[in-house]
């Protein structure tokens, strides 16, 4: 009987130990072989919906991946929205430069031009070195 509960992933067993005996009831419910009394309610709910409503611990156990996906889905959505806004403002690479200028016009214009020149020269040297290295290799 214990081996069945141990066969579950460790991540699931940890919240159970925190939640207490209620989680054991759901463990028995999810494992119909172990619990005969709860098997009827499990057959009706198929996913311990009754035990879910009675205790919150099974929700953390059974729908852990569901909760994670739900919690992750709203958080990246505002990020995607922000990225979408930037992409609309700056659809191309030169557009991103104009965006940076619009945010910090005075400071970025002079510095950016110098940096651009340095970056371009560095990139050229790097590409030449890489290409020559590849040829020799």
UniProtKB/Swiss-Prot annotation:
UniProt modified residues of type Phosphoserine: 132
Gene Ontology, cellular component aspect: nucleolus; nucleosome; nucleus
GO biological process annotation, one example: positive regulation of protein processing
One term of GO molecular function: zinc ion binding
The keyword DNA-binding appears for this protein: yes
Record's compositionally biased regions (Polar residues): 1-21
Annotated spans, Disordered: 1-137
Broad class of where this protein is predominantly found: nucleus
Keywords: Chromosome, Developmental protein, Differentiation, DNA-binding, Metal-binding, Nucleosome core, Nucleus, Phosphoprotein, Spermatogenesis, Zinc
Top-level lineage group: Eukaryota
Locations listed in the record: Nucleus; Nucleus, Nucleolus; Chromosome
Tissue localization of expression: Testis. Expression is restricted to haploid germ cells.
Residue ranges, compositional bias (Low complexity): 22-74
Biased composition (Basic residues): 78-91, 126-137
Family: Belongs to the nuclear transition protein 2 family.
Function statement: Plays a key role in the replacement of histones to protamine in the elongating spermatids of mammals. In condensing spermatids, loaded onto the nucleosomes, where it promotes the recruitment and processing of protamines, which are responsible for histone eviction.
Name of protein: Nuclear transition protein 2
Annotated source species: Sus scrofa (Pig)
């Amino acid at each position: 009987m214990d081996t069945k509960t141990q066969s579950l992933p460790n991540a699931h067993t940890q919240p159970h130990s925190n939640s207490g005996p209620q989680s054991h009831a759901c463990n028995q419910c999810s494992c119909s072989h172990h619990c005969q009394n709860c098997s009827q309610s499990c057959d009706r709910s198929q996913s311990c919906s009754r035990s879910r409503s009675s205790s919150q611990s099974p929700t953390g156990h059974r729908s852990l991946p569901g909760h994670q996906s739900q919690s992750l889905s709203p958080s990246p959505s505002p990020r995607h929205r922000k990225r979408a806004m930037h992409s609309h403002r700056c659809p191309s690479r030169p557009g991103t430069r104009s965006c940076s200028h619009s945010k910090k016009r005075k400071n970025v214009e002079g510095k950016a031009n110098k940096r651009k020149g340095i970056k371009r020269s560095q990139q050229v040297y790097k590409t030449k070195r890489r290409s020559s290295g590849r040829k020799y290799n």
